[in-house]
């Protein structure tokens, strides 16, 4: 769960050294000191640090070790989600498609090709960023246009059906990876080191870079994130149902399961 946040535990380890902790015990005072809001720190950041330590405390207690388990986190104010308009989405993908890597190395050209596909996959299927980047080819059926998502948020599995044009895009993409870039990675979206998948940080940064190239970037009060593509998928689907006269109340349970929600 915390593979992308290993550094937080490393920071806690350094914090313990700085605090001259000598007893093998996760004490209440130590946890409280670690969980104190720091100058200039966002509530969400502090809460995230404490949440990771809570999981560590639960792990220690499962081994029979003494550990204080934090429960009261700082609650960050909920951000207003930026719902991407059709024009913004069109401009974003135009920026993605116009991208030409500054470095001529084959690996960079391959990554640009990956960005063009992964952002479309997230938008067209409403995937979470982790679900898209951690896809294996063995979980994608290019013949029938399906994707198996395993052990996603809430440890839930589900089957995703792709539209025909998206399936064809994935088929062409697989051929390009194999024939043009000679990339035989098990990952659908391999990183520069092909035994690894694209990182969250890389995908987030590229999204921001492409968004900055759109004509909407300067006038946007709240810059969108990759997750906004998932929200845009939901809004578009619901709008289509309303235009077609399909009762939302009847369809929302199906949409919820498609998205991998618990309820």
Indicate where each model-derived feature is located.
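Conserved catalytic core of the tyrosine transesterase superfamily
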Residues: 1-263
């Amino acid at each position: 769960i915390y593979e992308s946040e290993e550094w937080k535990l490393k920071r806690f380890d350094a914090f313990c050294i700085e605090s001259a902790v000598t007893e093998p015990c996760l004490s209440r005072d130590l946890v409280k000191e670690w969980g104190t809001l720091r100058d200039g720190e966002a509530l969400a950041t502090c809460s995230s640090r404490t949440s990771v330590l809570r999981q560590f405390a639960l792990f220690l207690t499962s081994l029979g070790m003494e550990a204080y388990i934090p429960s009261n986190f700082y609650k960050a104010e909920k951000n207003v989600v930026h719902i991407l308009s059709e024009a913004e989405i069109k401009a974003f993908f135009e920026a993605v498609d116009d991208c030409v890597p500054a470095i001529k190395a084959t690996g960079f050209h391959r990554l640009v090709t990956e960005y063009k596909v992964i952002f479309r996959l997230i938008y067209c299927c409403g995937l979470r960023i982790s679900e898209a980047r951690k896809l294996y080819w063995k979980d994608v059926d290019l013949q029938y246009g399906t994707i198996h998502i395993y052990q996603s948020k809430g440890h839930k599995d589900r089957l995703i059906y792709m539209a025909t044009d998206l399936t064809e895009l994935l088929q062409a993409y697989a051929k390009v990876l194999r024939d043009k870039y000679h990339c035989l990675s098990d990952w659908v979206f391999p990183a520069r080191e092909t035994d690894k998948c694209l990182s969250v940080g890389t995908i987030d940064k590229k999204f921001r870079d492409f968004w900055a190239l759109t004509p909407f970037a300067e006038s946007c009060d709240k810059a969108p994130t990759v997750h906004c593509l998932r929200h845009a998928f939901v809004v578009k689907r619901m709008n289509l149902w309303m235009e077609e006269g399909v009762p939302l109340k009847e369809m929302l349970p199906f949409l919820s399961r498609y998205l991998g929600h618990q309820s």
